[in-house]
Amino acid sequence: MSANTTTTDNPIYSDYVSRNSLSVSPQLCEFIETEVLADLPIDADTFWQNFSELLNEFSPRNKALLLTRENMQAAIDQWHLNQIDKKDKATDAEQIAFLREIGYIAADVEDFTITTDNADDAIACIPGPQLVVPVKNARYALNATNARWGSLYDALYGTNVIELPVAKKGGYDSFRGAEVIRFARHFLDQATPLTNGSHADASGYTIHNGQLSITVNSENIALKNAEKFVGYTGNADAPKSILLKNNHLHIELLFDNTGVIGKDDAAGMQDIVLESAITTIQDCEDSVAAVDAEDKTLVYRNWLGLMRGTLTTEFKKGNAIVARGLNEDREYTSPKGNDFSLSGRSLLLVRNVGHLMTNDAVLDANGEAIPEGIMDGIVTATIALYDMQKRNSLHNSTTGSMYIVKPKMHGPEEVTFTCDLFSKIEQQLALPANSIKLGIMDEERRTSLNLKACIHAAKDRVIFINTGFLDRTGDEIHTAMEAGPILPKELIKDADWISAYEASNVVIGLQCGLSGKAQIGKGMWAMPDEMKAMVETKDGHP
């Protein structure tokens, strides 16, 4: 909701219940006390006391940061207006000096390397796709979480990556299917090449003495890099699947001589499954409409289901009712004959809202709607205790961390505020320092200009930085509104400053030591029907 003040005198809030110094929506209150705290070593009185302390300490700071934004923007607007009638326009150097004078450009920081530890491998060292999904929708939340593994054949057959007319409904298009298989085998030749020949000519895959053997033209051929074979299922002489690995990502070859595809394949290969959505942001912000207590309760309830491993949903597909829950882990046998498992689920981050929004699901001691980001912080972190304390079998983090993405922060002071908030929450929940990791979204102009200082402010807990065209462009337009006309959207995409923004994000991230410890993300793709364009666009990112 907006930042308007609300009071307990308003009849809308007449049924709110008193907790510590707060007035709380009965729906949210019941959810917290009977569902969130049900199996945690935290009683309701302690939770609400912690919540009240957070608001007392951080609400004034939150308001002060927003006032700083307003004052800086007013100064920038006036500076641009002052240039209109000047014969000699200000130089770039003069504009930079002005921005430093008002504190918009922060003081430089010395070179440093982030010290984040206990980040899961999915964050620290596995490169791959990251999904963003509205956590308010249980079906979408589950689909994204379960997208850790996906069929390459399906992805190619059902999208325009393959340069053929999209398959018609009502049956299998064998011509398109053949092109999918050709494309996929070429991918295998690139990712896991053979010492001789091609995967396209393979007629069998078996394991002998812990080594993968591929039959090509009646000869037994090995992988050029034998270490890329990491596991299998079934029998060694007739495996159900072969597990390969390239660039930290797994590739699973599935075999079924009776399958629709496998029966016509020389090697009996039915599908190729790729490790796909390595991480997923369960979103409480941009992709959801959560404006009141009812909405927020649903958002938090679904997050609770994910952290407890219990989230399920049902939906109708044709004439059948389909039930969906979280995928189990995937079991394999190593080349040496040892059993091991891989997560069947995407590693989850949760995006809280930024510093601007307030929400009247809880009213403070003055009857005002509270900063929603503070509420998101304490509630999502408390819920994450179920995973961090290993209270479920379908775990998220294996390192005892939780991951909060914080959007729309303006500069290092706002990042410092977030880190201080997280530190306080960690103390309240008896968590080790820096257990709550932070994703910094580089989507505001003041953050881009001060990215190194922003990362420095969170150097002990930062686990990603990323870019985003729409929000970053929007803030550029808003900030420079009085500077004159700006390019149309399509032309902005090719503007020098956008390219510089993307490149700078990567360079600064690497200079600050994010490689091997944190993610550097490259914006969101919101056009699922344009997969070919996505592949081409992402290939061009720095």
PLM-predicted stretches and their roles:
Residues 47, 76, 404, 440-443:
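Conserved, mostly hydrophobic/aromatic
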